[in-house]
Amino acid sequence: MSALTLSTQESRAASIIIKGVFTMCTAATYTTDSFYFGRNLDYEFSYGDEVTVTPRAYPFALRCMGDFRTKYAMIGMAYVAGEYPLYYDAVNEKGLGMAGLNFAGNAVYRKPKEGRDNIAQFEFIPWILGQCATVQEARTLLAHINLVDTRFSEQFPTSQLHWILADRDEAITIEAVGEGLNIYDNPVGVLTNNPPFDKQLFRLNDYSYLSPDQPVN
């Protein structure tokens, strides 16, 4: 069984994306009668990323937690190393979306800890989307998680990221930092790169004078 890849781009410079070196990324949600979740990866060339589908019951060999099979299918952008999809972002069949954004200099991952769900950074997106239908379900899992500093391989070091997780009802931001795991309610449904999310939210005050209304002459 393998992940279904939907393009045939070359895998040039793939290690850069795994390291988490980006220029500017933003993930955003939008809800009308439907729920929309998307992000941009603002680079001028491909890292070998492909539109990738992971089906239900797809096996992941988690480094600390052992065998894991997805309950829900997902689709997103990933670099596929062998048959292992390294997701940058994805949405599962229940409409739960997740994306990792650059958080260099702030992300802190820890050593495995007994009694916790020890999940590597590259395992995080499929581990959440593979078994959660909503943000609320994910909150329960996140109460027991320990994001660990395990590399995918010697060629692919750990990416320094923070994440947005969203469904049609709510969004949260997840940041592993020096003091521990911070989980923020995200009322705007948007996340970009550095700085930490609380500072991003505060900086919206700089734009409070803006309006979507047409200016009056």
Regions found by a protein language model. Name each.
Residues 10-23:
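Short, Lys/Arg-enriched N-terminal segments with co-localized hydrophobic residues
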Residues 22-117, 144, 149:
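A contiguous strand-loop segment
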Residues 67-82, 131-136, 140, 200-217:
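A short, charged
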Residues 115-146:
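Alpha/propeptide regions of enzymes that mature by internal proteolysis
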Residues 140-155, 162-164:
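Secretory/export targeting leaders with adjacent low-complexity proregions
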Residues 157-209:
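Extended amphipathic alpha-helical segments with heptad-repeat/coiled-coil character used for oligomerization
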